[in-house]
Structures are given as structure tokens and as C-alpha cells.
Amino acid sequence: MKKLIYLLTLITVFTQGAWATTYTGGVSKVGQQESNQVIDSKSGQGVEFAKITIPQKKFRTYTDANGNFELPRIQIDQPTILSVEKEGYRPFSLTINSSGSLNNPMKIEIAKSEAADISLDSEILHLGDDSFSKNSANAGDFRLKSIGPYYSKDFIMTSNAKRSTNYLVIGSIVGLDTKLAKAMGQNRIAAAYSSPAEIYFNGRKIGELHVNGDSQRIKIPNSLILADQKNQITIKTGQNMMPSDHIDYDDIEIMNLSILSE
């Protein structure tokens, strides 16, 4: 089952004519659709005035009264993040793999936010040292200056969280040059590879990120949660694993970080 979910998360569906790809939580499926549209995941109705951005391309637009939106002809040579934001809804992002993907109408389902949701960051973040190969995953789309090799955020979790199952959700991540990412063809580096990005909660390591993609979840052990107190998430980018006289950090970009309780 884990392998099936993993494959669904990474799959990209190419369609022709009026056939559209529906995106929901990083999973794609095919349906008939004439234009790009953002809809409510429960009602199926179009969501008005949702903001659509492709940060690396400095593109922004908004949906109309029916949730429809247009995308111009944008040159995309490597996977690039598209983000959807609307007040009262969970932030959503997906990875566009090529310019051809934008030629196919897409339907994006977004879910209303819950009271227990915690939005950590909806901006695109560049981790690393700004030193990367042109063959690195998504190197051509890196536009932001690095904030350093790690990202940390403090936030409060209530005692109710300890009675739920909690996850750190990473909307999208690009740029990982791990051994697994290389094996999957996500970069073109001939020999070198990096260690995976590491996730820490209150100073304890809770997971790793090995591949680029959307809607990746890391479970937060309830035993580590400090109820009604400050908690901290830290994401550390990996390092080049080839011998070197200095530390070479993997440059990655992440977007839409949140804590969800179920």
C-alpha cells in the first residue's frame, strides 16, 4: 500500500484535447474539462478569487467567479512549483514537470482548512549555499537567495493535538539530489549525490526527504509534542556525499509547510 500511494503521488498524467488532469493532494487523475479550474473538494463548486502563482517564473493570476483561470505560455524546462492560495482553504501546491503540462486543462481540488490546522509557511523557501551544478534537480529554476542550510519555525500546539495523529505536510519540494532522486531521473549529475534532507521536531529527528514531489507527510510522534507550549520544526538540507575539502550543501526549494491533525 505504501508503494502504491508513493507512486500515485509522483505520477504525471499527460492528456490531449479536452481531457484534463485533476489534482487533489498531489494525486492526479484524468477527467473531461475544457479549462483550468479550482474547485472545492467537497462541493465540487468553483472557488472564486483563488490566487494562482508560479513563484520561480514570477507569475500570478486569480480565478474568476466560476473558479476558472488561464495560464500563459511559460517556458518550463525543469519541474517547477505551482501554488494555489485562498483564505479559508488549506494551501495547495503541485509540481509542473514541463511546459507541455500547461497545455492540458487542469482541475485542482482544494480543501477547506480545519480549526486544528497550523500553517507554518506558504512562501517558497530556498535552503542550501547557492552553490549547485547546472545539472542539479531544478537548478535552472532557482531564483531566490538561500536562507541557509536549515529552516526552523516555532509554533504552539494545544493539548488536543496529543489526542490526534499529527503530520508535517510539505506541499512541494524540488532540488533534492539524493541517491534515490538520481535513480529516479530527477537530476542529471553524473556521479555525485547528496544525503537526504532531515526533519526535526523539538530537536528529535522524525524523518527524511529522499525524493522531489508534492504533499509529502512526516508523522509527528505525540510523545514529542509539548502541549500548549512552544514547539519547533526544523528542516535541514543534505550535504554532498563525495569527498571534498569543504561542506557542500544541497540546494533545495520547498513551499507550503503546515501541520495537520487527523
For each predicted feature, which ranges?
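Surface-exposed loops/turns
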Residues: 65, 76, 227-228
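Short, acidic Ser/Thr/Gly-rich low-complexity loop/linker segments typical of extracellular
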Residues: 57-70
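A short, solvent-exposed loop/turn motif at the edges and junctions
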Residues: 77, 81-103
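Hydrophobic h-region of N-terminal signal peptides that target proteins for export
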Residues: 11-18
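Beta-strand-rich domain onsets/edges
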Residues: 18-33
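Beta-strand-rich recognition domains
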Residues: 28-31, 42, 95-262
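Sec-dependent signal peptide recognition
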Residues: 2-7
